[in-house]
Amino acid sequence: MEPSKMEVKIISSETIKPSSPTPSHLRKYTLSLLDQKYTPIVVPAILFYERPQGVAPLDMDRLRTCLSQTLTAFYPLAGRAESRDVIICNDEGIPFVEAHVDCELSSVVKSLSSLGSDLRSFYPPRDGLLEGGIQFAIQMNVFSCGGFAFAWYCTHNVTDGTSTANFFRYWTALYAQRSEYAVQDLMDFNSVVTAFPPVPPRVPQEEKPVTTELKPEKQEGQEKEEKKKSSFNFSFQSHIVARSFLIKSKAVAELKAKSVSEEVPYPSRFEAVSAFLWKSIVSSSTTEGKTMINMPVNLRPRVDPPLPLDSVGNIFENALVQSEKKAELHEFVARIRGSISKMKDFATEYQGEKREEAKDAHWKRFIKAVIECKGKDAYVISPWYKSSGFTDIDFGFGTPIRVVPMDDVVNHNQRNTIMLMEFVDSDGDGFEAWMFLEEECIKFLESNPEFLAFASPNF
C-alpha cells in the first residue's frame, strides 16, 4: 500500500502512571538553575524499527508495565510542571497511545519526504504538554509487517537530550529484559540541583528589561530601529522548510583533512562537519558581517567534580560561537574549538555564589550576538551523538533504522536549527544533518556543487 493511502488507526489511548507512588518527601521537585534558564518547548522525534526475522511482535501490555516501572524511577516525569521553577510529582502519568498502520514500514521510510501532514498521524496529541504541565507523550505505531514507529513529544522542562535518551533506554532495557538497571532504583535528579542550586523565582516584570542595556549607540532619527533591535523582535517573512542531508564517512574524513590548521591540528569529526555546514549556509548570504551559532554542550563531565552520566536535568549550556561570514573552513573550526573549550569555566561560574549574575551575563552575550548578526545569520547546531543514547534505544528489535526529529510542522522554535546525528555506513561513521532553514537557503544548498560534493540529499 502506498503511504498516501495508509491509515493510522488508534487502538487505545490512556495515561500510564508510575507503578509505585512517589514518596511524600519527593512530591515537590525544585528545578535547578540550568532548568530555570530555558523556556519549555515541545520537542518531537520519531524512531522507525524493523522487526527482525524470528523476533516476537511487540507485547503492548508489557510495554505499558515497563513504562509504568520506568516512571517510578523517573518520578518527576510523571508529575506536572506547576511553574518554571517547580514540578509537582503527583504521579498523574503521561499519555500513551497505541496505533496500527495498515501498510509496510519500508514503504513509509522510503517515502518520508512525501508524507506531508500524514507524518503527524504517527504522533500523540500535543494537548496539555505546555499548558497542562505534562512532561512526555508517547505513541507506538505498529505496521502490518510487524515493524513499528515510536513517536514522542517532550517539553524540555527537566530533561535534556541525554536525560530523554536515558529515560527511553531504561524503559527499553526493562522491556527487553536487559540488566542495565534495577527495576526500582530512583534515578539521580538531585546531583544537578546540588551542583547548580536554583535562584529565587522572578516576577515577570523583572524579566523584561534583560535586553535594555544592549541598545546600540543612540543616533538621531533611529529611535524606532533601536527599539526594534533592543526588543530582540526580528521579522522573517521567508518560509521555513526541513531537509536532511547525509555526510558519509569518506566525506567526513576529507572535511577533517581540509580543516587542519596550526591552531587546530587535529580537528574532530564533529568540528569539521559543523564548520562545513555553518560555512555552507552562510555562503548563501549576499551580505557581509557576522554570523553565530549556538551549540548545546553537555556539562556533566565539565563540572568539578563531574556529575554522573545518568544524572537527569537540562545539564547543558550553549557554546556561543561567532565568526565573520567570509571566514575559511579552518577558521570556523577554530572558533568552534575555542568556544567549546570555555564551557568548563561557565560550569564553574554557574556553581558559584554569583550564579544568577553569570546566567544573566551569558544571556546578554547571546542577545548581543544575535543583534549583531540581525538574527538572520544566527543558527543552532545540536548534536545527537551516539553517546547521547538516541540510536541505542533498543526494544529488542535492534537500533532504529531511521530517526526523524520533526512532525508535520516546522515551527518557529526550529528556525535556523541543524540537528546533527551520527550513523554508520559501509565505510564507517557518518552524519545525517537535519536542517530547518529558510526556503531560499535550502534551494541554494541543493544547487551548490561545493556543498553537494560532501552532502547528499536524504529527505
Curated annotation (Swiss-Prot):
Pathway: Secondary metabolite biosynthesis; terpenoid biosynthesis. Pfam families: Transferase. One of its GO terms (biological process) is triterpenoid biosynthetic process. Disulfide bonds: none annotated. It comes from the Eukaryota. Its EC number is 2.3.1.-. It is an enzyme of class 2 (transferase). Keywords: Acyltransferase, Transferase. Soapwort saponins possess anticancer properties and are also being explored as enhancers for endosomal escape in targeted tumor therapies. They may also serve as precursors for vaccine adjuvants. One of its GO terms (molecular function) is acyltransferase activity. Mainly expressed in flowers, flower buds and young leaves, and, to a lesser extent, in old leaves, stems and roots. The active site is at H156, D394. InterPro entries: CAT-like_dom_sf. Belongs to the plant acyltransferase family. Monomer. Component of the oleanane-type triterpene saponins (e.g. saponarioside A and saponarioside B) biosynthetic pathway, leading to the production of natural products with detergent properties used as traditional sources of soap. An acyltransferase that catalyzes the transfer of an acyl moiety to QA-triF(Q)RXX to produce saponarioside B. This is BAHD acyltransferase 1. The lineage of its organism: Eukaryota, Viridiplantae, Streptophyta, Embryophyta, Tracheophyta.
